[in-house]
């Protein structure tokens, strides 16, 4: 999923927090920053004024303006022109410093947004870098029901009619929490972290065949829903195989694997759906098993080792 942000959107999102005021270059409010073309390149998303490797949002503090003032008139003009030619998303002056007229004129002429803020440079840098990194982070929508089970994020997937929503409803009645139904959105906010959220349109809602759309917050209370959760496990519901497996190894280890989501391999446990099986209990057990494995405890490996030791002791 492609993500982007315009200068106007960034200004509106951070105006109150950073006290931003628009000083010049308002014609460039539609200037856009796209994730695919910026995140992997050398320039930072936000940083102090850099004319060699220009940042996407250039911050001008007292030292940067003093450096510009120390330049010869022609060199100063060439430097300002070079800054504008790099097409930054915006320029931000710290501590409400008076904006130099030549900088203001260049911003208006080139359509480069120029903002003023009462904040210090490091505050602007921290807030803008974090906000842009989150906004432009890689993201994907996966079909399924995303829940918090035993304090970890679990995505329940499966074909249409496999019982995902019914399973989610039973898990809710057992005290677990809903994050998103049908179309949870996952954002890679760190190299090993996928943050799952619910689209605004679907918040608090769960669709169950025969019942229609249910408002989980109204039915189960505020504690039954959660705004976001990190994805740690995928439980996939599938129809049982018609042919027997060629070996019994899966009877020991279960049907476990991984699913590649963005840049991460997420642990995957597959549960066959058959009449009479309590999927809620099985999903809870799968979650507990995953928690044990993250602690280095693998019951199947322990049994295999115990069995091997027993055979060795009985071998003459």
Swiss-Prot record:
Q: Which residues bind Mg(2+)?
A: 165, 207
Residues annotated as catalytic: 143, 164, 182, 251
Q: What class of enzyme is it?
A: transferase
Tagged with keyword Transferase: yes
Which Pfam families does the record associate with it? Hpr_kinase_C, Hpr_kinase_N
List the cofactors: Mg(2+)
Parts of the chain that traverse the membrane:
none
Q: Which InterPro entries match?
A: HPr(Ser)_kin/Pase (IPR003755), Hpr_kin/Pase_C (IPR011104), Hpr_kin/Pase_Hpr_N (IPR011126), P-loop_NTPase (IPR027417), Ser_kin/Pase_Hpr-like_N_sf (IPR028979)
Task: State which Enzyme Commission number(s) the record gives.
Answer: 2.7.11.-, 2.7.4.-
| Keywords carried by this UniProt record | ATP-binding, Kinase, Magnesium, Metal-binding, Multifunctional enzyme, Nucleotide-binding, Serine/threonine-protein kinase, Transferase
Where are the annotated segments for Important for the catalytic mechanism of both phosphorylation and dephosphorylation?
206-215
Q: Which HAMAP family match?
A: HPr_kinase
UniProt family annotation:
Belongs to the HPrK/P family.
Q: State the domain notes.
A: The Walker A ATP-binding motif also binds Pi and PPi.
**What's in the misc comment field?**
Both phosphorylation and phosphorolysis are carried out by the same active site and suggest a common mechanism for both reactions.
Described purpose of this protein according to its UniProt entry: Catalyzes the ATP- as well as the pyrophosphate-dependent phosphorylation of a specific serine residue in HPr, a phosphocarrier protein of the phosphoenolpyruvate-dependent sugar phosphotransferase system (PTS). HprK/P also catalyzes the pyrophosphate-producing, inorganic phosphate-dependent dephosphorylation (phosphorolysis) of seryl-phosphorylated HPr (P-Ser-HPr).
Q: What is this protein called?
A: HPr kinase/phosphorylase
